[in-house]
Amino acid sequence: MPSVPSGPLRVALPIAADHPSYPGHFPGQPILPGVVLLAELMEAMRRDAATAAWLGEAPQLTQAKFITAVRPGQALEAEWTLPGGSGGRARFEVRLLAADGQVIGVAASGQIQAEGAP
């Protein structure tokens, strides 16, 4: 198993402005559904070998808070921190970015528990 990083991991979280979930959620005022945001986050987390090994096959979302709506074309970054050892919960945050890369808000935050963790 790869070693658990000691600090936060941060990645761009690109979601296409023409993502198929936008037109129906909501017509005329499209926002990204929370379930899509979480699915994209999980895919990003699984691309990191250490995070994927820590998560296991069936991690549990133990807490999620949706703070700011994500509009089509909005730039996002995801950051998460894994706890030391095999148990515990990873904390995550998905941030909204300005064109210059500066954080302008938080779209979502929460915790994910590794498979089999108490």
Predicted regions and their residues:
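Catalytic strand-loop segment that frames the active site of acyl-thioester-processing enzymes
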Residues: 1-32
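Generic structural signal for residues positioned in beta-strands
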Residues: 10, 63, 108-109
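Hydrophobic residues in beta-strands and at strand termini
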Residues: 13-15, 66, 112-114
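Compact, glycine-rich, soluble single-domain proteins
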Residues: 24-33, 37-46
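Hydrophobic beta-strand-centered segment that forms part of the acyl-chain substrate-binding groove
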Residues: 42-82, 89
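HotDog/MaoC-like acyl-thioester-processing domains
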Residues: 70-72, 81-118
